[in-house]
Amino acid sequence: AAAVAIETLKIYDEIDLIGHVKSVGPHLQAELQRRFANHPMVGEVRGVGMVGAIELVEDKAAKKNFDPARKIGPRLVKHGEEQGVILRAMMNDSIGFSPPLVITKDEVTEMLDRVERSLDALSVELRRESIAAV
């Protein structure tokens, strides 16, 4: 097991994985902020390095969470699957991002394009439900 770990560390060094993460991580964080901080359904964008999350809220100004019975996070995950992106729903309708450490900046852009399309589809779905409930 130790030999495998040592070989893995050698590969990380050969491909400069740490340098790559130091380059791509800030790009991921900046893109998360740029794309989602002002979205009406996003109450908070948070993260560090190659890990991030967006918190989905019903009312951005009041930071009011959705009713848990509506399962908004899992519904966004489903839309993500339809867009070809894997999302992780967490407590309080937060969606987590933890892409592979070898992801490129272009792939981050593509991933977040798909997340945006998923969030847009969920927004349309929720508006339809609101109209139907009236």
Model-assigned labels for residue ranges:
Residues 1-134:
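Conserved N-terminal phosphate-binding loop of PLP-dependent enzymes in the Aspartate aminotransferase
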